């Protein structure tokens, strides 16, 4: 498996325009190959922090999101588009790892998380602020551009627009998180299926089982909506109620498929 050396750093927010730039072909990539992608030294600190703060099923969901993101990157994610700034594979992976592993800190039920002054905000903002406070530690060696992209992507990962520009980091966390929570139909029939091979999904789900993610996601989102009726995910078409109804309980790809 060979990844492109660079990718488009920014993408159209409009989903159809994004798809037009991509060259997706869902080739099978083994989880073993994805595990072999090098990570920056700071990833361990984010892994341990997310494991401590995020509820277990949400944490395992975050791990799956990272590997889904890598598979999508390998299968035709926009790269080398004329006039678009490029980001190296190594740099993008660094940002995507921290974003994915930390993106649901706002689901926390820990005393530390619930005592945080941001706990009454929409969970994406609450989690983004906690991620910022964690990532700005000097020993993690993230500059302002890296930190800004990671935190902004966490804060906006449930938001979609038809105009403007998003970073590739934000696009990947949105794609992978909605794939894991809603399944292959999240962006319409055949869309996510064009980006990632079902066997790759199956291997990731087998290694990192979804457990009761569906129930935990519903509980986290409904609890957040009671505390913050203006929560960001409430802007999903049809509102929070419509989103909650389509959350998956079953594996995305059944083990026998």
Q: Model-derived features: where do they sit?
A:
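Divalent metal-dependent phosphate-bond-processing catalytic cores, especially two-metal-ion Mg2+/Mn2+ enzymes
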Residues: 1-30, 55-56, 70-90, 159-257
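Active-site flanking loop/helix segments enriched in acidic
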Residues: 44-66, 106-113
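Alpha-helix N-cap/helix-initiation motif
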Residues: 54, 116-120, 227
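Buried hydrophobic packing segments
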Residues: 62, 66-69, 73, 127, ...
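Divalent metal-dependent catalytic cores for phosphoryl transfer on phosphate-bearing substrates
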Residues: 92-199
């Amino acid at each position: 498996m060979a990844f492109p050396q660079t990718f488009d750093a920014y993408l159209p927010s409009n989903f159809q325009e994004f798809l037009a730039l991509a060259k997706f072909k869902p080739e099978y990539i083994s989880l073993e190959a994805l595990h072999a992608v090098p990570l920056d030294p700071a990833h361990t600190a984010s892994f341990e922090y997310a494991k401590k703060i995020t509820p277990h099923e949400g944490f395992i969901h975050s791990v799956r999101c990272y590997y889904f993101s890598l598979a999508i990157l390998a299968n035709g994610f926009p790269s080398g588009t004329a006039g678009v700034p490029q980001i190296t594979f190594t740099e993008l992976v660094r940002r995507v790892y921290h974003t994915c592993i930390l993106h649901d800190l706002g689901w926390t039920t820990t005393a530390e998380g619930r005592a945080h002054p941001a706990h009454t905000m929409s969970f994406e903002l609450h989690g983004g602020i906690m991620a910022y406070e964690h990532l700005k530690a000097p020993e993690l060696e993230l500059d302002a551009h890296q930190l800004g992209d990671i935190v902004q992507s966490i804060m906006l990962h449930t938001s979609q627009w038809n105009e403007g520009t998003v970073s590739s980091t934000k696009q990947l966390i949105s794609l992978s998180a909605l794939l894991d929570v809603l399944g292959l139909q999240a962006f319409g029939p055949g869309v996510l299926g064009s980006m990632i091979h079902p066997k790759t999904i199956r291997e990731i789900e087998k290694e990192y089982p979804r457990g009761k993610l569906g129930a935990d996601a519903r509980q986290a989102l409904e609890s957040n909506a009671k505390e913050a009726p203006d929560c960001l995910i409430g802007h999903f078409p049809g509102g929070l109620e419509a989103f909650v109804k389509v959350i998956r309980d079953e594996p995305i790809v059944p083990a026998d498929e």
